[in-house]
Amino acid sequence: MQYGFWSVVPPILTIVLALVTKNVFISLLIGIFTSSMVLCGGAPLTGLNDAFYSFIHTFESSGNTITLISFLLIGALIYLIEKSGGVEGFTEVMLKKRALIKTKRGANIFTWLLGIIIFTSGSLSCMVTGSVSRPFNDALKVPHEKSAFIVHATSTPWCVLFPLSGWLAALAGYLTSGGVPENEAISVLLRSIPLNFYCILAVFGTLAVSLFGINIGPMRKAEDRAEKTGSLDNPGRGGALTDEAMSPSKAKPRVLNMLLPMGVLIATILAVLTITGKGNPTQGAGMQSLLWGCILAVLTICILCVAQKLFSVDEVINEMFKGMGTMLPVAGILLFGFTMGNLVKDLDTGNYLTSVFMGVLSPALLPALSFLLCMLLSFATGTSMGTMAIMSVICLPMAISMGISIPLVAGAVFGGAIFGDHASPISDTTIMSCATTGCDIIDHVKTQMPYVLIFAAISLVLYVVLGFVM
């Protein structure tokens, strides 16, 4: 059955509500209900019933189920690492290295490298990198605006470029919700990484800024202020959030409790990918590898906690479930996104939009348009996950229908979504970067804005060019 114009009403309504309410859950929920109403012919009660069952149907996909389970396990892993002193142990080791840092440039580069090492979570990266680097950044008179800029740029953007964590499950899940076959999701994701220009520029552009001291506009003023007056913030600004952000573990610092589980996670993922791919990791079973990696990593940290007498068996199980609970909001967005994606497929929204825009919009401009729309939505809502959940089910089906490179459009969607996480003043990583470095939020947004706009502009041009080439 063809739904015509009505097939675009639910996704458009979802986008508008996300922009107005800043609440992705409510927006997706209303989008799911509206989609079900359109599919059943407009009967509200039937639509409500169908919307309920659409959530159940989401679990018929093994890929969706594995993704959600893996995400919860990642939450348990990170939580137990923190509670067992793993993060504190790693922090202690890094602090011992600060005696080797003698210059501002060295401090900036060390902060960048530390952000690269912490790749499992954008929030965790902000917390660890910001708190570890702050003492020597402050001692060497690095303005808090510069510290926050580096900490922020190496958090979520790097997690997306190096997704050996819960991000692997999330990004692959968004691809499948957009119509990419489950057995091809990991391959498409890997091919999209070199095409995620915004994240590449954000991470390595920040390295260039650190190496060569490229200070633009407000950042130049911040550097001059720190150099001339010794003040790391504008008068009366900065530092207020630091104590709230820090919640260190009471356990004895144990770096092993971070390095061993993370090593098991990475090694298991690579091993299962190689085995299931018959020697070729890119052809391996990505979702199964992530699930096994998470299971063995969680098992490893649980054994360490019990062996070190930090928790009893019952206590470590309770702590594990507490950790899973920390990931429920993100898992909820994933579930809602998967469900919305299934309904949008049933509405055939992608093919309808393709038929409408074919005569008006060159298919080659789809990657650039996808990037731009995701930028705007993520900046307004402050959420990359929510933007990916909403826009993947719109942009990817159009790419499939138009015959446009799916990795290129996926890179555009993911990069545009990360722009908001990176640039928006209401993003959680923006707040956390400022909290751990002691920077005022508005000062951080103002000083990094010239850089992120340059990165975004270059990315947009590349998507326009490659849209015609690929």
Task: Give the positions of each predicted feature.
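Alpha-helical transmembrane segments of multi-pass membrane proteins
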Residues: T103-I118, V142-L168, E182-L201, A222, ...
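Membrane-core helix-loop-helix motifs of multi-pass transport proteins
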Residues: F136-S231, P248-L256, T430-L462, G467-M470
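Membrane-embedded alpha-helical segments and adjacent helix-loop junctions characteristic
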Residues: L45-A148, L310-M402
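Hydrophobic transmembrane alpha-helices of multi-pass small-molecule transporters
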Residues: M1-F71, F197-C199, S210-L211, E227-T339, ...
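Short helical (or helix-break) motifs at transmembrane helix termini and adjacent helical loops
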Residues: M127-F136, A417-M432
